[in-house]
Amino acid sequence: MSQHKNRVGLLVSAVGVVFGDIGTSPLYALKETFSGHHPIPVNPENIFGVLSLVFWTVMLLVTVKYVIVIMRADNHGEGGSLALLALVTELTRGRRVHYPLMMLGVIAAALFYGDSMITPAISVLSAVEGLEVVTPDLRPYVVPITAVVLTALFAIQSRGTGLVGRLFGPVMCLWFITLAVLGIVNVINAPGVLKAISPTYAFEFVFRHPLMSFYALGSVVLAVTGGEALYTDMGHFGRFPIRLAWFCLVLPALLLNYFGQGALLIHDPSAIQNPFFRMGPEWMVVPLVALATFAAVIASQAVISGAYSVARQAIQLGLLPRMTIVHTSGEEAGQIYVPFTNWTLYLAVMALVVGFQSSSNLAAAYGIAVTSTMMIDTILVSFVMALLWRWNMALVITVVGTLLAVDIAFFSANIIKVAQGGWFPLFIGFISFTVLTTWRRGRALVRKQLKKQAVPLDVVLRALGPNVSRARGTAVFLTAATDGVPPALLHNLKHNQTVHQRVVLTTVTTAETPYVPDSERVHMTDIGDGFHRLIIRYGFMQTPDVPAALVLCKQFGHEFNMMSTSFFLSRETFVPSLNPGMALWRERLFSFMTLNATRATTFFKIPTDRVVELGTQLEI
């Protein structure tokens, strides 16, 4: 009985977190198709054609591509572009495609941030715009109300969303039931609309009106925004609950609502100004606006939490500098808060709300990031099909070719909207890509320089004679290199002429898996003369904790008393090089990021009163 309750609870939670983004798409998808920047005439022929396109887009891009195919490509249970990237880079290591695929994954992560800025803005704006259906006099209040709602949402992030999060599942279940009921009520008035399930209507629409259907694709894709979240959030809930929730509740509710909106438009074409809020009786508009706003906030929360998760993954995979990561729950390790990410998102979202003013204006910006990410996911998963699943090459080409053709069609329909707002996700993607690749390149140059300057450990051990005093206690030297002597140790020897009785050269590494169990966390070897090499491994979904890892060294017969242990860290500063490894502006950007990165002491949870920092100058 308790196991059944747990499954139901997991199912409800999955509905609350995973499907918020795609669940709010009915607020604007059909409206934008018929009244957006390239409006389509509202007549039965076009309504049937668009509904057929929506139906098969949802079935192909979400049900087949993500739910059936890509969700099989988990990285030890985790999903998402960076998890998929880590899996693919491991599979292609040593092959020519390794670097291009890595760059594709980085582009997907960069585009995600553009998407995560647009989602809260368009979701809450489209929900609050329902007030205009009550009376047009409320139109001037839409943007201020949206700003207040979003400000409150971002302000509570530091306190955690555990308590409020318990309401997410039930509220979203109510939302999807409401979508279904509204859809059924309207379909009953025009049941013939269900004939649009046949793909012939989509094909006829495309062949009869090629240009119009091309423009329509740019808005139809809004029906699948958030589809990638099914894969991204797989690590939190598992494959089965997400698939069950999709097939049993979310998919039927979405399709019923879209067909209900289509039935309404056939019966009353003037409802196109806001078909969703016109689906029910007048008395229902205000409660529906309230429920839609709650659903939009939940969709925004899911994206914000996803942005924190991607930031942590990027830090662990060496794509971003160290940032402060706050755990907001003692029970859920996945509930984190990244202050820098939070307030950067907030400022961008506010700029979008104030700058674009309406969901219609924002819709043009939305599609490019989504279609680009979906296209990259298709390319990455093709290598999983071929190298991990060992599918027949003909099957891989057929499946990937079909999915990629659909992705390219939608991407092409959205790229023409650059001037109307599509420039924004491309601009954010470019900035994010520049930051990610500059940090990755800079750290690679630093590692190269450190390796070049490194003194072999055996040379230092031989040089340790009777004249070098041994201080009592333990010295832990943190170093990125797994061989040689850390610069901090050389500086300590040079200036203090002393070495501790026990010296532990410690390297924290990130595995290409999301989690590393405690049993595999540490590996310690005795080098001799009181020196030890310690390797601490974490997954890219975990936050490093060096003192906690030292406790695990008991299995090697070593115990660490924090009061007699000193931690030595190198503080790197960079000087101009005659042969720079990067352009000057990238060197300056890298230096700026290094200067503003969270201190290693804080990031690795090392007691500040036990830390000694020694400066090191490097040319990059």
UniProtKB/Swiss-Prot annotation:
It is a multi-pass membrane protein. Keywords: Cell inner membrane, Cell membrane, Ion transport, Membrane, Potassium, Potassium transport, Symport, Transmembrane, Transmembrane helix, Transport. The keyword Transmembrane helix applies. Pfam families: K_trans (PF02705), K_trans_C (PF22776). InterPro entries: K+_transporter, K_trans_C, K_trans_N, Kup. Its main location: membrane. The chain crosses the membrane at residues 10-30, 50-70, 102-122, 136-156, 168-188, 211-231, 246-266, 284-304, 336-356, 368-388, 393-413, 415-435. GO terms for molecular function: potassium ion transmembrane transporter activity; symporter activity. It comes from the Bacteria. It is found in: Cell inner membrane. One of its GO terms (cellular component) is plasma membrane. It catalyses: K(+)(in) + H(+)(in) = K(+)(out) + H(+)(out). Transport of potassium into the cell. Likely operates as a K(+):H(+) symporter. Belongs to the HAK/KUP transporter (TC 2.A.72) family. This is Probable potassium transport system protein Kup 2. The lineage of its organism: Bacteria, Pseudomonadati, Pseudomonadota, Alphaproteobacteria, Hyphomicrobiales. The gene is kup2.
